[in-house]
Each structure stands twice: as structure tokens, then as C-alpha cells.
Amino acid sequence: MQPITTEIVSRTIIKRPADSHKGNYGRIMLIGGNQNFGGAIIMAATAATYSGAGLVTVATDPSNFTSLHARLPEAMVIDYHQTDTLLNLLAGMDVIVIGPGLGTDTVADQLLTAVLAATHVPQRLVIDGSALTLLAQQARPLPATDIVVTPHQMEWQRLSGIAIKDQTPTANHDAQQRLGVMAVVKAHRTTVYTDERVWFNPGGTPAMATGGMGDTLAGMIGGFVSQFHNFTDAVLSAVYLHSAIADDLAATRYVVLPHQISTRIPTYMHRFSQIERP
């Protein structure tokens, strides 16, 4: 295993050109948030927005519209029950994040199937939360494009068939190879599995053990892969920065909340963008 290093982050997060516009930094759609779990998609969308995604669209249950408008006025919202509208918009997206707060009912299952069928190269796909449970319950074809799954250990057990106690780096890497997608397995020391190697995140703190932390990471990953060309480096940088911010906050806090991480993402990205490169 290799550690995710600050060198990876600093070569990924670069200064923005002076003539930039929002179209340069990716169009991202985040899909999730049923009537009971609207907070999950709000936290994911917040992280994507603060990570610098150019245009953010949230497809969610209408019960979440008011909260989304109030908490994140930068994001556009659509009703995820209107499948035709969703798929028409999805065709123009650079990145799709599906799963935070999605649930596992029939509506969620049909939505996941439709999104997987519609996603295409060169779009990038982040699969998180409930969508991973649905994939574990029923295997279905995955699009031939850049995909990252972001399971915690129990979700990885369902998806890979490997019991938590047996989730060694070797076993996990074998499972990742079979699945054919990048895997971010969240644990005390999160590990990232690519076709070529295994990475481990040196950061992380028990202060992060609270609901919504994974939703925030999924949104960060979506925001990073929407604007940075190297898919692997973008994912690794999001994983690293998510924990690095939390570690700094935990120096003076017993608990770190997801939104506290999100609001600090631009500051940390700016810091890395200022590092002089050879």
C-alpha cells in the first residue's frame, strides 16, 4: 500500500486560469434524498458546490426543495420522479453522483437502473449510499466509463461478499478487480483501490464519526472529478482533503460535523493551489 500524499493533492489542485468560467469546472448532477433522508443529498450537494463544481443540479424528492433552496441557493433542483426530464438533463452532465439518501424502494431501484443505462463516456459516475445497497441486491450492467464506488465497510461487505473481519487489502483489491471500478472503502483508515495499486489515507479522526460524513465525501469526490482531469488523482485528493480538514478541526472539537468540513474546502483548496511547482 502507498499513502496518499500532499504531493498528489498539490499537483491536482492548481491555480485557475484568469479567463475561467463556470463551464470549465464541470456540470454535476447529484441524485438522491427521499422524503426521509433529504439531509444526505443536501450535504452531498453542499460539498460538491464548495469543492468548486461549475454547475450543480440536484435531482431529489420535492419535499426537499425548500430546504435545498434555503441551504444551497447555488444549486438547481429537479424532481427525480420526472424521469424523462432527469434523463434529458443527465445527458449534458460531466459527473453524476447517485445514492446519498436515495433509499431502496421501487422508485430508487428504477431510478438507479435508468441512470446506469443512460450514463456514457466521458461522463464520470460516483455511486454511494443506498445505490450501493441496491447494486448488492441486484447486479446490473455498469457503464463503460470512469466509476468510483464509496462504500463503508458494511456496504462493501454487501457489494463484495467479503465479511468485515476478512476485508484485508489483498481481498479488497481482488474484489475491486472483479467489479472493475475504483473503490473507496471507508474505515478508520480509508483505503482506495484502483486497477494498478492500493492507497491508504493517513488522515482521519474519531471526531468524524457522525451521520452525513460519507455523503459529504461523495459530494467532494464529485466536485473534484468534475474539474480535475486525472480521475485517480482527483479521487485521492478529495479523500485526503476531507480527512485533513477534519483532523485540523478536531484539534479543538470533540465532534466534527459534515457542514463544517464543506465550508472550509475552498480555503484548503486555495492553500494547495498556491504551492510552487517545479
Curated annotation (Swiss-Prot):
GO MF, one example: ADP-dependent NAD(P)H-hydrate dehydratase activity
Q: Which EC class is this protein assigned? A: lyase
Could you say which cofactors this protein requires?
Mg(2+)
- PROSITE patterns per UniProt: YJEF_C_1, YJEF_C_2, YJEF_C_3
Q: Which family does the entry's similarity section mention?
A: Belongs to the NnrD/CARKD family.
Write out the function statement from the record: Catalyzes the dehydration of the S-form of NAD(P)HX at the expense of ADP, which is converted to AMP. Together with NAD(P)HX epimerase, which catalyzes the epimerization of the S- and R-forms, the enzyme allows the repair of both epimers of NAD(P)HX, a damaged form of NAD(P)H that is a result of enzymatic or heat-dependent hydration.
Q: Which domain of life is it from?
A: Bacteria
Gene3D superfamilies listed in its UniProt record: 3.40.1190.20
YjeF C-terminal domain mapped to chain residues:
5-272
Q: Which organism is it from?
A: Lactiplantibacillus plantarum (strain ATCC BAA-793 / NCIMB 8826 / WCFS1)
List ligand-binding residues for AMP: G214
Name the Gene Ontology biological process terms.
Answer: metabolite repair; nicotinamide nucleotide metabolic process
Q: What is the designated name of this protein?
A: ADP-dependent (S)-NAD(P)H-hydrate dehydratase
